[in-house]
Swiss-Prot record:
It comes from Enterobacter sp. (strain 638). Keywords: Metal-binding, NADP, Oxidoreductase, Potassium. GO terms for biological process: purine nucleotide metabolic process. One of its GO terms (cellular component) is cytosol. The lineage of its organism: Bacteria, Pseudomonadati, Pseudomonadota, Gammaproteobacteria, Enterobacterales. HAMAP family: GMP_reduct_type1. Signal peptide: none annotated. This is GMP reductase.
């Protein structure tokens, strides 16, 4: 046993210090980025925000809606091969280039993914997603996937430390997904005591990944557009959003009505709700590590997408970054004890 004395920070612990700027308008800020990925050699350009691979967020409808903003969607892994084929046949090439196929690490997952990618060669992203990316089996699966699909851009996660980020990139991942426990409907930290404050995880993993020519996704912990800006400021190449994109028309959650008001169910992928739906319940040897919440219906996701992108542009103008790529170079974080004046928050 040992204790690390270094302070670790989340998004709520900091603000971004403003700096002199020559930008005249938020409209001068370019949010689009271009990446060429280490192993696949693929090039992608767009706004590096990703809808999370949760079945109440990462739907085909969400992918179609967000593609118009050049935003990516990691489509959840519970669609069948037939559903994938039908979607790919009806979607435009522009939509498909903003879509990630998600998979677990079982033999069944591998065979299903193989069928999807063979039938739909226009799909270029593969997101290999498990709650705990520290297992030897997971690293072996990433290597197996890289060998099977050398020209696909592979995302692997989740981890929160530099050495594991490096191991996954060396095993064949182009992009590493960073975050254990920060999600709005994740209870891993309270059920297990395991986790890492998200901003510090992003800073550490970005340094490790960039040293090897890889990229990272900050996954979880964002509750508002300012948090998205902080994640990019900390060095994230992409930011994945779950709760911020839940509850919309495209989110796919079950709609319930209470006292004349409609709500949409949103749950973590390790919650009892998710396991009841997909694997027949919570196994006796494990605990649920997620919760279910009811969100007021929020309308089309385009309004939220515009809000997030507008907040990002504004953050860039405050520090003089004319492009999103420059934000991390222009970011100085200051530690704080308050984020906002909350006097009217209850009204």
């Amino acid at each position: 046993m040992r204790i690390e004395e270094d302070l670790k920070l989340g998004f709520k612990d900091v603000l971004i210090r403003p700096k002199r700027s020559t930008l005249k308008s938020r409209s001068d800020v370019e949010l689009e980025r271009q990446f060429t990925f280490k192993h696949s050699g693929q090039t992608w350009s767009g706004v590096p925000i990703i809808a999370a691979n949760m079945d109440t967020v990462g739907t085909f409808a969400m992918a179609t809606a967000l593609a118009s903003f050049d935003i990516l969607t990691a489509v959840h892994k519970h669609y069948s091969v037939e559903e994938w084929n039908a979607f790919a046949a009806s979607a435009s090439a522009d939509v498909l280039k903003h879509v990630m196929v998600s998979t677990g690490t079982s033999d069944t997952d591998f065979e299903k993914t193989k069928q999807i990618l063979i039938a739909n060669p226009a799909l270029n992203f593969l997101c290999i997603d498990v709650a705990n990316g520290y297992s030897e089996h997971f690293v072996q699966f990433v290597s197996k996937a890289r060998e099977a699909w050398p020209d696909k851009t592979i995302i692997a996660g989740n981890v929160v430390t530099g050495e594991m980020c490096e191991e996954l990139i060396l095993a064949g991942a182009d992009i590493v997904k960073v975050g254990i426990g920060p999600g709005s409907v994740c209870t891993t930290r309270v059920k297990t005591g395991v986790g890492y404050p998200q901003l510090s995880a992003v800073i550490e993993c970005a340094d490790a990944a960039h040293g090897l020519g890889g990229q990272i996704i900050s996954d979880g912990g964002c509750t508002m557009p300012g948090d998205v800006a902080k994640a990019f400021g900390g060095g994230a190449d992409f930011v994945m959003l779950g709760g911020m994109l839940a509850g919309h028309e495209e989110s796919g959650g079950t709609v319930v009505e209470e006292n004349g008001e409609k709500f949409m169910l949103f749950y973590g992928m390790s919650s009892e709700s998710a396991m009841n739906r997909h694997v027949g319940g919570v196994a006796q040897y494990r605990a649920a590590e997620g919760k279910t919440v009811k969100l007021p219906l929020r309308g089309p996701v385009e309004n939220t997408a515009r809000d997030v992108m507008g907040g990002l542009r504004s953050a860039c103008t405050y520090v003089g970054a004319s492009r999103l790529k420059e934000l991390t170079k222009r970011t100085t974080f200051i530690r704080v004890q308050e984020q906002e004046n909350r006097i009217f928050n209850s009204l």
